[in-house]
Design a protein with these regions (language model features):
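Short glycine/proline-rich, acidic loop/turn segments that cap or connect secondary-structure elements
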Residues: 134-148
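Active-site-adjacent beta->alpha loops and helix N-cap segments on the catalytic face
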Residues: 5-24, 39-44, 54-88, 97-116, ...
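C-terminal alpha-helix
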Residues: 170-178
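Glycine/small-residue-rich phosphate/adenosyl-binding loop
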Residues: 51
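Hydrophobic faces of well-ordered beta-strands that scaffold small-molecule active sites
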Residues: 1-5, 30-36, 54-55, 74-77, ...
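Glycine-rich beta-alpha junction loops
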Residues: 124-130, 149-150
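Eukaryotic N-terminal low-complexity, Ser/Thr- and Lys/Arg-rich leader segments
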Residues: 180-182
């Protein structure tokens, strides 16, 4: 299991430090990482606080250097075949297609045609429904990431953790089913 903490808002790094401590005790098998990282100093800070992986909305070679030095996987956001290629050249195994809802499944399919070795995660506009998830997996995405559509504010505010768990479980089932029919 992996969980990406979004680096957004004042004192986000302090909240992350507490979440890492909680996860180490309550979910020791879960990899805690950080997302929305755009520069090397931010990557360094979160790595020092315990991030097991770093995700960004864009590709920054300086973030790749920091992560490579500490053997921390870096998944940069890429919006073109060129960006994916450049990210792979500096050691990024998994590249994030972002924003997915703008680029679409055909972008992933087109990318994988000349670069079938590419490992692709799609975020931004992925929704926890069977058709949406299947469209990405069938296009060649290796995995998808979801945020507010998987964790709606109203559900979180109500403390309805069963609904969150159910939606996560359903989404994983949709991924498995899409992979089987691929």
């Amino acid at each position: 299991r992996a969980f990406e903490f979004t680096n957004r808002g004042d004192f986000a790094h302090e909240v992350f430090a507490e979440v890492v401590k909680f996860a180490a005790k309550e979910c020791p098998d879960m990899a805690m990482g950080v997302g929305s990282v755009v520069d090397a100093p931010t990557a360094s800070l979160y790595i020092q606080l315990g991030a097991c992986f770093v995700v960004g909305p864009l590709f920054n070679p300086d973030v790749a250097k920091v992560c490579n030095r500490r053997l921390i996987p870096y998944t940069p956001g890429c919006g073109s075949v060129t960006e994916v290629g450049m990210a792979q050249e500096v050691g990024c195994d998994l590249c994030k297609v972002f924003p997915g809802d703008v680029l679409g499944p055909n972008f992933v399919k087109g990318l994988k045609a000349p670069m079938p070795w590419s490992l692709i995660m799609v975020t931004g506009g992925v929704s926890p429904d069977a058709d949406n998830i299947a469209s990405w997996i069938k296009a060649g995405a290796n995995c998808v990431g979801m945020g507010s559509k998987l964790f709606p504010k109203a559900t979180i505010a109500a403390g309805d953790w069963k609904a969150v768990s159910d939606k996560c479980r359903e989404s994983l089932e949709y991924v498995a089913k899409a992979r089987e029919s691929k």
